[in-house]
A protein has these predicted regions:
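S-adenosyl-L-methionine-dependent methyltransferase catalytic module, highlighting the catalytic core
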Residues: 117-122, 129-226, 232-242
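A short SAM/SAH-binding and catalytic strip from SAM-dependent methyltransferases
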Residues: 103-114
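Class I SAM-dependent methyltransferase "Motif I" SAM/SAH-binding loop
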Residues: 46-48
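Short conserved loop adjoining the S-adenosyl-L-methionine
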Residues: 92-98
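Class I SAM-dependent methyltransferase Rossmann-like catalytic core
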Residues: 10-25
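Conserved alpha-helix/loop element of class I SAM-dependent methyltransferases that forms part
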Residues: 23-39
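Class I SAM-dependent methyltransferase SAM/SAH-binding core
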Residues: 51, 55-92
Length: 258
């Protein structure tokens, strides 16, 4: 179930798009679905109406489970027979044991998390792979909108005004990769997409990816951990600092025998 380290090519993404076209999924969800191996354990954090989970359960026979904050979304999922519970990805991932899933998915949700770094750590604690998709705030149209109008950008992939958007932690591709480096997470794959989910045709380097990609899908994994480093709900324990040597007792002169 190992994934290639290199980014998916535009040609490969086009094949995925054509093969999955017409299944009712968003394009980024179609790409995510293509990354999932059959008969694996999958958790979708912020699964909305359960479209991705239903597709994976139907076409790949996965053990599909989800967490959704919205009662309406939970009702839609349960009405389809999906194993979805109402919960908050910011806090409820901590209750899952280590290595509970093969894949943990966070699609267009990380920007709405209160503590994205802790969510990523927990994703890679409970899952073998983490798959994250998000909107790129460094896209050139967003930069131009802010420069020209002096207002928070709005575009196809950023449809809501600043005061009503759920995106409280917007980020760029460079921001996300930097965070992964800080957390010690391994980027197995990176796919750069336009707003409609098709491959970004102008992206050919990290700098161009950050400028011309409206959204991206990352596949993450964690470095191998020693059993002694596993802490449920926490990152790997850091080495303890050595304690300072005790101070020598003050010198006292011997008593005068006379």
């Amino acid at each position: 179930m190992a994934l290639p380290r290199s980014a998916v090519s535009a040609e490969a993404l086009a094949v995925v798009t054509n093969r999955l076209n017409g299944n009712g999924l968003r394009q980024d969800l179609r790409l995510i679905a293509a990354l999932i191996e059959p008969h694996t354990r999958v958790l979708d954090v912020g699964c909305a109406d359960g479209a991705l989970l239903a597709h994976l359960a139907r076409t790949k026979g996965v053990d599909a489970r989800g967490i959704e904050l919205s009662p309406t979304g939970v009702h839609e999922c349960v009405s389809q027979g999906l194993a979805v519970v109402q919960g908050d990805g910011d806090t409820d991932l901590a209750i899952y044991p280590d290595d509970s899933f093969d894949y943990v998915i966070l699609s267009q949700t990380i920007q709405a998390m209160r503590q994205p770094h802790l969510v990523l750590e927990n994703m890679l604690r409970i899952g073998r792979f983490g798959i994250v998709s998000f909107t790129n705030y460094a896209y050139w149209r967003a930069r131009w909108y802010l420069l020209r109008r002096g207002r928070m950008p709005m575009a196809r992939c950023l449809p809501d005004p600043w005061y009503s958007t759920a995106n409280i932690h917007p980020c760029t591709l460079e921001d996300f990769e930097h965070l992964c480096t800080e957390l010690g997470l391994r980027i197995e794959q990176r796919s750069c997409l336009s707003a409609d989910g098709t491959p970004s045709r102008l992206a050919s380097s990290r700098w161009l990816d950050n400028l011309f990609s409206e959204q991206a899908v990352f596949v993450l994994s964690r470095p191998a951990r020693r059993p002694a480093d596993r802490r449920s709900g926490r990152a790997a324990a850091r080495p303890a600092r050595p304690l300072p040597a005790p101070a020598a007792p003050p010198h006292r002169p011997a008593p005068d025998p006379s």
